[in-house]
């Protein structure tokens, strides 16, 4: 995984810098999201792995599938990625681009797993507190997992806050073992 990220980083950075310079972050995010989805399609995977096809043929096929969703710069980007046999990296490129975009926009996706359903008021309050703590705009994705017994687990990038009963029991069990 780390190797794929390392290979994808220069492409994501180049796309981000271009999109930022031309104030097209949302457009490029959508185009790269589409490219990532197309590259993961089973039929497209076979095309990308076909040894008989040249890089230019793979790029042309890829662009044909995407139709008019790509502007000239995006088509050029796909051609450059294809020349270097990196089309299978498009999901990683899109993910890194979205990370750069979120950093630029000072926003973060936060995954909240709760033992019980959170009502809108609780979600709004949690988003407000997390926004203040992280100094970013917070977009919550709330899931329910009854195995937590009680409390919540919050994931924002590398930050994990485990306020669940299950987590506390696991810590207590670990402390008793040592």
UniProtKB/Swiss-Prot annotation:
- Broad class of where this protein is predominantly found: membrane
Give the UniProt subcellular location, in the record's own words. Cell inner membrane
The UniProt keywords, alphabetically, are: ATP synthesis, Cell inner membrane, Cell membrane, CF(1), Hydrogen ion transport, Ion transport, Membrane, Transport
Q: Write one Pfam family the protein is assigned to.
A: OSCP
Record's GO cellular component terms: plasma membrane; proton-transporting ATP synthase complex
Please give the InterPro entries that the UniProt record associates with this protein: ATP_synth_OSCP/delta_N_sf, ATPase_OSCP/dsu
Q: Which PANTHER family match?
A: ATP SYNTHASE DELTA CHAIN
Task: Please report the name of this protein according to its UniProt entry.
Answer: ATP synthase subunit delta
């Amino acid at each position: 995984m780390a190797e794929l990220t390392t290979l994808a980083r220069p492409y994501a950075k180049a796309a981000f810098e271009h999109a930022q310079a031309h104030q097209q972050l949302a457009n490029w995010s959508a185009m790269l999201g589409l490219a990532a989805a197309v590259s993961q399609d089973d039929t497209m995977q076979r095309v990308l792995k076909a040894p008989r096809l040249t890089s230019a043929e793979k790029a042309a096929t890829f662009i044909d599938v995407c139709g008019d969703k790509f502007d000239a710069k995006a088509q050029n980007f796909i051609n450059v990625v294809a020349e270097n046999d990196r089309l299978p990296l498009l999901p990683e490129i899109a993910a890194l681009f979205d990370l750069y975009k979120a950093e630029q926009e000072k926003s973060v996706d936060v995954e909240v797993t709760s033992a019980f359903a959170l009502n809108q008021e609780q979600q709004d309050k949690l988003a407000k507190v997390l926004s203040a703590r992280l100094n970013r705009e917070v977009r919550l994705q709330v899931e329910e997992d009854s195995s937590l017994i009680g409390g919540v687990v919050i994931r924002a990038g590398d930050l994990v806050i485990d306020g669940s009963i299950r987590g506390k029991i696991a810590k207590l069990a670990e402390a008793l073992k040592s």
